[in-house]
Amino acid sequence: IAGWKNIGFVDEFIDATKDWHIDDLDKIILKFENSEYRREIFCRGISQIDGKGAHRIMKAVIRMFYEMNMDMRLAKEEDLLPLFELTNDRMVRQNSFSTHAISLDEHRNWFYATLKNRARRLFVFYEKEKLIGQVRFDIEENNSAVISISIGANYRGFGLALCLLEKALRHFHERERQISKIYAYVKTENMASRYAFIRAGFKDCVSDNKHALKYC
């Protein structure tokens, strides 16, 4: 609909807020007596159809299901193995600034240190007993923090990153009111994360890392 409005296809026909008069409707109907006008309107309308409407609706329904049924909480010991699997997911490693595979011992040491780290908040998201993803905050000096996100392979492509970010940011701000600035560092080629952070309200900042973009 938005695309049709931009090209002037639907403005005249489905403006529910307009105070219609019978004379207005007569004028619109009369326009369609002109074959050139009908051809022009047809071409405008068909130009915005890509055959993916059903796919978009399906994705939106799936996203709504997970948004309504997911639970968020701080990580605890039982999340060790689910997070280990997520950490070693191919795309997660590819989008990380440290791309090597993580051993279980290495992950275990990091995980238990994270649970004890008072400057780190690790939120996990589950649908029933299945891990959807995680959002992590690392609190730094000057009342700032760095945020990162990763989502499991089965939950990508539905637009869930925005939901996870918004939920985590809201809970983090409620608990850490002293934090005035939150930054995200994203690899330049990681378009999905870049788009998610922008939709969550982050903006481009100057970055001294040539391999990453900084959002704040």
Q: What are these model-predicted stretches?
A:
Residues 91-109:
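Conserved GNAT-fold acetyl-CoA-binding loop/helix
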Residues 31, 113, 171-175:
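A generic secondary-structure signal
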Residues 21, 34, 76-79, 89, ...:
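Acidic/polar helix N-cap motif
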Residues 112-124, 133:
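A short helix-loop-beta-strand connector motif used in the catalytic cores of GNAT acetyltransferases and
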Residues 1-66:
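Nucleotide-activated sugar donor-binding and catalytic core shared by glycosyltransferases
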Residues 69-75, 80-82, 86-87, 128-216:
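Acyl-donor (CoA/ACP) binding surface of acyl/acetyltransferases
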Residues 11-15, 73, 121-123:
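Structural signal for short hydrophobic segments within the conserved structured cores
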Residues 83-88, 107, 111:
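Hydrophobic alpha-helical core bundles mediating ligand binding, dimerization, or RNAP-core interactions
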